[in-house]
């Protein structure tokens, strides 16, 4: 039996190093096996990158992270150029090692006590009116990092009284009650937790997560905060069927979720799960119609849609693709 890999605290493990730590092995995709991107997946980069550099500089100044950068989001240039960003708290090292995600895995450092104040000041300096806060998974913390979310919500509102806050939270596995108690007095304006894929694919796509647990987290939060909208998102192109996606949508509605995002999965590298299929825009349109028929009040469905992509517009019910 081989010895387990000893991870150093604070070291980021990515790509092949990260995948080597996953119990279910994912063989690197050969270049000839990679699906060619269709025309609708081509991104036009903005001509002016100054706004992008300004936002990156603001992040570096206060030692903050954006999921846009850490997860290699394809919409980074567009969102940064429009002056929006999704902040990632609790460091940039995740205790999980999902094979679809480009965020680094490892043993994270202790949470930075001053991060909530730094985050609030950065948001104030950027003059944001709507902000999305997410985090890595922190299975090493008693509350999964929930109190840190609550502290960030409190500090952001203290300095930015008119802002709207959306939190994209992890599943708080094994500590849901403690986490929800921590969020009780400082909830967000929108509570987002992604199911990511159909339950059949969880062992491959979300090792360490549980489909029913995630649904229960969404249900319990909504029960405690009936006036706060709950939201969830799914990736397409990982081998799921349309019928499976529709069943997930029904499960979400049965658990009180009213906001939805559906987007195309893109493999960050050949070491990650490969794209099984590029879903055409017409199919996203069809799923949006189904979602609205099921009772979702907001449904952003399209190849480039991500949880926080134009989240301010999503919250207003405007069409996002």
Curated annotation (Swiss-Prot):
An example molecular function term from Gene Ontology annotations: 4 iron, 4 sulfur cluster binding
Organism: Vibrio cholerae serotype O1 (strain ATCC 39541 / Classical Ogawa 395 / O395)
A GO CC annotation given for this chain: cytoplasm
Full protein name: Lipoyl synthase
Catalytic activity: [[Fe-S] cluster scaffold protein carrying a second [4Fe-4S](2+) cluster] + N(6)-octanoyl-L-lysyl-[protein] + 2 oxidized [2Fe-2S]-[ferredoxin] + 2 S-adenosyl-L-methionine + 4 H(+) = [[Fe-S] cluster scaffold protein] + N(6)-[(R)-dihydrolipoyl]-L-lysyl-[protein] + 4 Fe(3+) + 2 hydrogen sulfide + 2 5'-deoxyadenosine + 2 L-methionine + 2 reduced [2Fe-2S]-[ferredoxin]
Superkingdom, taxonomy of origin: Bacteria
Gene3D superfamilies recorded: Aldolase class I
Family: Belongs to the radical SAM superfamily. Lipoyl synthase family.
Subcellular location: Cytoplasm
Keyword S-adenosyl-L-methionine part of the UniProt annotation: yes
Pathway, per record: Protein modification; protein lipoylation via endogenous pathway; protein N(6)-(lipoyl)lysine from octanoyl-[acyl-carrier-protein]: step 2/2
Required cofactor(s): [4Fe-4S] cluster
Residues the entry annotates as binding [4Fe-4S] cluster 2: 94, 98, 101
């Amino acid at each position: 039996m081989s010895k387990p890999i000893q991870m150093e605290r604070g070291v980021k493990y990515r790509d092949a190093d990260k995948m080597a730590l996953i119990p279910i092995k994912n063989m690197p995709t050969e270049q000839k096996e990679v699906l060619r991107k269709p025309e609708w997946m081509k991104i036009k980069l903005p001509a002016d990158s100054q706004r992008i550099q300004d936002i990156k500089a603001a992040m570096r100044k206060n030692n903050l992270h954006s999921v846009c950068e850490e997860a290699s989001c394809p919409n980074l240039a567009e969102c940064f150029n429009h002056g929006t960003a999704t902040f990632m708290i609790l460091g940039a090292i995740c205790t999980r090692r999902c094979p679809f995600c480009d965020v680094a895995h490892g043993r994270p450092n202790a949470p930075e006590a001053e991060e909530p104040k730094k985050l609030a000041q950065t948001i104030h300096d950027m003059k944001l009116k709507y902000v999305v806060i997410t985090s890595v998974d922190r299975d090493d913390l008693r509350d999964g990092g929930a109190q840190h979310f609550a502290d960030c919500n409190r500090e952001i509102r203290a300095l930015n009284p008119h802002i709207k806050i959306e939190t994209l939270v992890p599943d708080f596995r094994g500590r849901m009650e403690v986490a929800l108690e921590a969020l009780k007095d400082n909830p967000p304006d929108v509570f987002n937790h992604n199911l990511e894929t159909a339950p059949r694919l969880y062992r491959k796509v979300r090792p360490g997560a549980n489909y029913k647990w995630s649904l229960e987290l969404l249900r319990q939060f909504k029960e405690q905060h009936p006036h706060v909208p709950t939201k969830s998102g799914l990736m397409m192109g990982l081998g799921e069927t349309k019928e499976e996606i529709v069943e997930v949508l029904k499960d979400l509605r049965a658990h009180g979720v009213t906001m939805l995002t559906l987007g195309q999965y893109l493999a960050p590298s050949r070491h990650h799960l490969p794209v099984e299929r590029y879903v055409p825009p017409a199919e996203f349109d069809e799923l949006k119609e189904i979602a609205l028929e099921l009772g979702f009040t907001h449904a952003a469905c399209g190849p480039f849609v991500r949880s926080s992509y134009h989240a301010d517009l999503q919250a207003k019910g405007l069409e996002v693709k």
